[in-house]
Curated annotation (Swiss-Prot):
Protein name: Thrombin-like enzyme asperase
Domain of life: Eukaryota
One term of GO molecular function: toxin activity
Activation/inhibition comment: Inhibited by PMSF.
The EC number(s) this enzyme carries: 3.4.21.-
Propeptide part(s) removed at maturation, as residue ranges: 19-24
Cysteine disulfide links: C31-C164, C50-C66, C99-C257, C143-C211, C175-C190, C201-C226
Matches recorded under InterPro entries: Peptidase_S1_PA, Peptidase_S1_PA_chymotrypsin, Peptidase_S1A, Trypsin_dom, TRYPSIN_SER
Assembly with partners or alone: Monomer.
Alphabetical UniProt keywords: Blood coagulation cascade activating toxin, Disulfide bond, Glycoprotein, Hemostasis impairing toxin, Hydrolase, Protease, Secreted, Serine protease, Sialic acid, Signal, Toxin, Zymogen
PTM notes: The different mass observed by mass spectrometry may represent 3 different glycoforms that bear a single non- (27066), mono- (27357), and di-sialylated (27649), fucosylated complex-type dianntenary glycan chain.
Function: Snake venom serine protease that clots human plasma and bovine fibrinogen. Upon intravenous injection in mice, this protease renders blood unclottable (defibri(ogen)ation). Intravenous administration (10 and 5 ug) induces a gyroxin-like effect: loss of the righting reflex, opisthotonus, and intermittent rotations over the long axis of the body. These effects persisted during approximately 10 minutes, after which the animals apparently recovers.
Residue ranges constituting the Peptidase S1 domain according to the UniProt record: 25-250
Length: 259
C-alpha cells in the first residue's frame, strides 16, 4: 500500500497511496539541535499537522497535501518538552500559494505550497533559512531527511525530538517499478535505501530532503509500511519549482508551475 504521509486532525487517511505529512523518520537518530534550523512545525488546535522549511525570513515551503485551515507555524523547535529561548510562532499572512494548474483530485500532483508569514523571522541560534537549489541532485547523492514523524514503520510512535537519517537519490525507474499504479512525475525525486530500513513516514510530510546543504526535496508520499526494501519515498523536486517560488515571492501571484 502506498501512503500519503499526512496527519489531518490526528487521523491517518488510508488511500491508494499515502502522503507522508505528519510522519517521523524511520531508521534515524535524534538530530543535532543545530542541524535543523530551517525546520518548521505546522500545527492547529488539534495538534501537529506537518513539517515545513524556512526558505526566506518570511516564507515557508511545505507540501500542498499539508494545506489546512487555521494553522500556525513554530520555528526553532527541538524538543516538545523543553523550549528553546529563541522559538518563534507565526501565522500565515494570507492564503497559501498553490500551483494554479494542480489537479484538485490528485493530492500528490504538484505537491508544493508556499506560505507567507505574518511577520519576518529573526535568524538565531536555532532558526535560519535553507538555500534553494541551484541544480537538481544527481543519482547516488547522499541526502538528509528529518522530522518529528513516527519512528515505527507500522504504528504511530512519535518522538519528542526530530530524527534525522541519510538516504540516497535513486533512479526514477526504481519508484516507477515500486508504484506501477501511481504515476511518478518527472517533477519528483525518488530517494531512499534500496535494502530498506531508512525512510520518512507518517508525520514527516512537508519536511525537507537536504543534499549538499541545499533544499532539494519536499516529503510527499511513499509506501506503507515505511522503510521497506525497494519501496523508496517520493519527494517534490524543488529545483523544478525555483522560478515559481521566486515569482511568488516577488509578488507575481499568477505565476505558473511546471506542467
Amino acid at each position: 500500500m502506498v501512503l500519503i504521509r499526512v496527519l489531518a486532525n490526528l487521523l491517518i487517511l488510508q488511500l491508494s497511496y499515502a502522503q507522508k505529512s505528519s510522519e517521523l523518520v524511520i531508521g534515524g537518530d535524534e538530530c543535532n539541535i543545530n542541524e535543523h534550523r530551517s525546520l518548521v512545525v505546522l500545527f492547529n488546535s488539534s495538534g501537529f499537522l506537518c513539517a515545513g522549511t524556512l526558505v526566506q525570513d518570511e516564507w515557508v515551503l511545505t507540501a500542498a497535501n499539508c494545506d489546512s485551515k487555521n494553522f500556525q507555524m513554530q520555528l526553532g523547535v527541538h524538543s516538545k518538552k523543553v523550549l528553546n529561548e529563541d522559538e518563534q510562532t507565526r501565522d500565515p499572512k494570507e492564503e497559501a500559494s498553490l500551483c494554479p494548474n494542480r489537479k484538485k483530485d490528485d493530492e500528490v500532483d504538484k505537491d508544493i505550497m508556499l506560505i507567507k508569514l505574518d511577520s519576518r523571522v529573526s535568524n538565531s541560534e536555532h532558526i535560519a533559512p535553507l538555500s534553494l537549489p541551484s541544480s537538481p541532485p544527481s543519482v547516488g547523492s547522499v541526502c538528509r531527511i528529518m522530522g518529528w514523524g513516527t519512528i515505527s514503520p507500522t504504528k504511530e510512535t512519535y518522538p519528542d525530538v526530530p530524527h534525522c537519517a541519510n538516504i540516497n537519490i535513486l533512479d526514477h525507474a526504481v519508484c516507477r517499478a515500486a508504484y506501477p499504479w501511481q504515476p511518478v512525475s518527472s517533477t519528483t525525486l525518488c530517494a531512499g535505501i534500496l535494502q530498506g530500513g531508512k525512510d520518512t513516514c507518517w508525520g514527516d510530510s512537508g519536511g525537507p530532503l537536504i543534499c549538499n546543504g541545499e533544499f532539494q526535496g519536499i516529503v510527499s508520499w511513499g509506501a506503507h509500511p515505511c522503510g521497506q526494501p525497494h519501496n523508496p519515498g517520493v519527494y517534490t523536486k524543488v529545483s523544478d519549482y525555483t522560478e515559481w517560488i521566486k515569482s511568488i515571492i516577488a509578488g507575481n501571484t499568477a505565476a505558473a508551475c511546471p506542467p
